[in-house]
Amino acid sequence: QKNELLYAKHLKIEKTKKILGIARWIKKIPINNSLKRIFIVGWYGTETVGDKAILAGIVNHYKSEYDNKVEFVIGSLYPFVTKRTCYELSINASVVSTKTFELLSNAKSSDIIVMGGGPLMDLNELYVPLLAFKVAKAYRKKTVVFGCGLGPLKYDKFENAVKDILSYSDEIKLRDY
């Protein structure tokens, strides 16, 4: 519980400017040079049928692009739900919590960071793709927004976060806007 308070204190939109200082102290995860590591973040852990379909589409896209030489890590708000989804969809992936510094360690250690599915809208959880992309760009990683919706955006804090996410993105593939 003490760690949860520490993570909650630092993993939020308002801490974007300080996050690189924290990320510097977090160990990189060793990589397998023969595999591309794809770190997928989004609103996983709250999966709808649409979220599951988009996740399967993202996984199939990168398996095809890299001839199955890929390793998937999925960042989840509720990992136990996402583990069940991976089982149901026969997706071989590690699942990590986006409520811990695993978010940062995977963002700096993966080859490609994908914000996949779900909307970019007024949600406090926008810190997930925002912080992941900010760290990824600092470590020269590729970032992709894949299959997301856009809006509604009513508050400046969230509108600015979405603008930052999109500006950090190397590729943007929206489903609607």
How should these model regions be labeled?
Residues 172-177:
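A short, active-site helix/loop in glycosyltransferases that binds the activated sugar's phosphate group
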Residues 157-171:
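Membrane-proximal helix-turn-helix segments that form the acceptor-binding/catalytic region
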Residues 1-155, 164:
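Aromatic- and Gly/Pro-rich donor/ligand-binding loops
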